[in-house]
């Protein structure tokens, strides 16, 4: 069975266990997946994740998600606002919008992602709305400009680049090139100069020759972002990428990954340093270590202060003056 039928596994097993049961094959097909199951979850009591979309109509050469999750589909704005209001009524302070391809929201309802963001932005009692990973070709100037004017939408963008080489992007069958990606980042910096910009990159894909990786590295070196999320390419059966003959050894993938992670560490440290002495709106989430508690600012910066149980789940404005590093990475205090 596929993801759509996973809740039917128990009934199938029960049927098999009956004395009169006959052997049968149950086979789910992704083209039969049409419904959207609204869901939300929480990693702690202040931040909640609201799934607004599922599935994907893109067919990147290295990816199996469309086969596993089916076509792009979503809940209605009205149903998602209702769920978000329930989250806030239960004490949620921050909502993160998630999905497989959230920028494609509206395929099944004829609505637009920016209109969903506008509707959620009006919910009384919600402190912060954060957008998770969104494709660069779907991250419109209209959406960026709205984020710049909103008091609730966090100035935090997570954008999958995958490669800074146009040759590799073509082999991946991505729907943009490096020029469009640069334009998106530059527009963010014009209207939200201090925004956090996280970028996904895959290294060692089939077809990533040394010169293409160097193109990617230099593209990122010149780009004003905050942090990289680096992934080493792994083969997926049934993908068209397997038809590309040129492969990268595991050792070379590791070397390339390490170079990008060092670049990311340097960029992230500089980003934290830029915020020293600047006020941060922090939602306090949990205990940290050595008598400290941890929270995230609107810029997705980790901030710590002396632990106070009564402050967990509240928001306060602080001005950090120290950049420190612990087991969990950089944080401000």
For every predicted segment, state its role.
Residues 9, 97, 131, 159, ...:
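Residue-level signal for inorganic ion chemistry
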Residues 1-104, 142, 157, 179-190, ...:
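Proteins enriched for Cys/Gly/acidic motifs involved in redox and nucleic-acid/cofactor modification
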Residues 105-125, 172-175, 235-266:
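Radical SAM enzyme [4Fe-4S]-AdoMet core and its adjacent flexible, acidic
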Residues 243-333:
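Terminal RNA-binding accessory module
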Residues 42-46, 56-57, 153, 163, ...:
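Short flexible coil/turn linkers enriched for glycine and charged/polar residues
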């Amino acid at each position: 069975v596929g993801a759509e039928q996973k809740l039917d596994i128990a009934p199938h097993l029960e049927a098999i266990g009956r004395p009169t049961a006959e052997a049968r094959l149950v086979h789910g097909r992704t083209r039969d997946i049409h419904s959207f199951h609204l869901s939300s979850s929480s990693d702690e009591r202040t931040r909640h994740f609201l799934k607004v979309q599922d599935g994907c109509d893109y067919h990147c050469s290295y990816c199996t998600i469309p086969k596993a999750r089916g076509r792009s589909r979503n809940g209605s704005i009205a149903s998602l606002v209702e769920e978000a209001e329930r989250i806030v009524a239960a004490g949620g302070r921050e909502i993160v919008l998630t999905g497989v391809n959230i920028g494609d929201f509206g395929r099944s309802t004829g609505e637009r992602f920016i209109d969903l963001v506008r509707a959620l932005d009006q919910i009384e009692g919600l402190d912060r709305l954060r957008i998770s990973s969104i494709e660069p070709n779907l991250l419109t100037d209209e959406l960026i400009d709205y984020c710049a004017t909103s008091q609730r939408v966090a100035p935090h963008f997570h954008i999958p680049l995958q490669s800074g080489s146009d040759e590799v992007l073509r082999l991946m069958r991505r729907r943009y090139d490096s020029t469009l990606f640069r334009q998106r980042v530059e527009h963010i910096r014009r209207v939200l100069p201090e925004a956090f910009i996280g970028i996904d990159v895959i290294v060692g894909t089939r077809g990533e020759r040394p010169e293409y990786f160097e193109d990617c590295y230099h593209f990122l070196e010149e780009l004003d972002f905050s942090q990289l999320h680096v992934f080493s390419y792994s083969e997926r059966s049934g993908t068209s990428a397997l038809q590309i003959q040129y492969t990268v050894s595991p050792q070379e993938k590791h070397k390339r990954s390490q170079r990008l992670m060092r670049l990311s560490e340097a960029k992230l440290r500089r980003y934290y340093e830029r915020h020293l002495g600047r006020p941060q709106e922090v939602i306090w989430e949990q205990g940290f270590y050595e008598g400290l508690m941890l929270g995230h600012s609107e810029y997705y910066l980790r901030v710590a202060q002396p632990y106070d149980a009564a402050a967990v789940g509240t928001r306060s404005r602080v001005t950090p003056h120290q950049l420190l590093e612990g087991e969990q990475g950089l944080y401000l205090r």
